[in-house]
């Protein structure tokens, strides 16, 4: 991909919506796969009362729409302004008591885990037709749309997996039976293995579609056994990718 094409795909623009200022991709098709669309607002005529506490709206009690769910509430039930990066808002926006905690938890992904994914980690990567694994660095592209795998020159060299084409993710753990399987219709209730409990993430299997090919392609990432910090970095990257997969499926289910 030429630098000119890449720049055009990564271009962004500032837009003003009823909810606030948003920095969105110039071309909608090139948006982050983790993003959410703005919800339609419940029409004013359909909500004469707060949808949380049932207080009637009047001249003194104004109605406000939650920017995340689009429902209308009184100021007491929708007075928190919280960052909502999945909708590309520039500033914190008004959210209801139910949505605000969700957005705060997602902020941890953008503040901590996304940085891990962008930095990358070293894995033993096994492709479905490979006889032996290749040592490769796996990282998320800056536009969040691709997983980039770069080898040491002895194997396939460079591979790209489009995040939006990932169909299933299976976490490989040690300390408990085989890990959770994520799919478009089934999400695990457990936390990522590296974030708590006795299990520890040691790898991940990805299944994804490839343009022009039938069925699913599969690859497996496994953290190496070396004693230095690269294994720790790899397990942290796996936990971050586990969270990213959950956000990906939520975006699809919107």
Swiss-Prot record:
Broad class of the protein's primary localization: other
Subcellular location: Cell junction, Focal adhesion; Cytoplasmic vesicle; Endosome
Organism per entry: Bos taurus
Binding positions for Zn(2+) 1 per the UniProt entry: 50, 53, 74, 77
Protein name: Zinc finger FYVE domain-containing protein 21
Pfam families the record matches: FYVE, ZFYVE21_C
Subunit structure as annotated in this protein's UniProt entry: Interacts with PTK2/FAK1.
Gene Ontology MF term list: zinc ion binding
Iron among keywords: no
CDD domains membership: FYVE_ZF21
Entry domain remark: The FYVE-type zinc finger mediates interaction with PTK2/FAK1, and also interaction with PI(3)P and association with endosomes. The C-terminal region exhibits a structure similar to canonical PH domains, but lacks a positively charged interface to bind phosphatidylinositol phosphate.
Region (PH-like): 107-254
Chain's role: Plays a role in cell adhesion, and thereby in cell motility which requires repeated formation and disassembly of focal adhesions. Regulates microtubule-induced PTK2/FAK1 dephosphorylation, an event important for focal adhesion disassembly, as well as integrin beta-1/ITGB1 cell surface expression.
FYVE-type zinc finger locations on the chain: 44-104
Presence of the UniProt keyword Metal-binding in the record: yes
Binding site for Zn(2+) 2: 66, 69, 96, 99
Gene Ontology cellular component annotations, sorted alphabetically: endosome; focal adhesion
SMART domains on file: FYVE
Alphabetically ordered keywords of this record: Cell junction, Cytoplasmic vesicle, Endosome, Metal-binding, Zinc, Zinc-finger
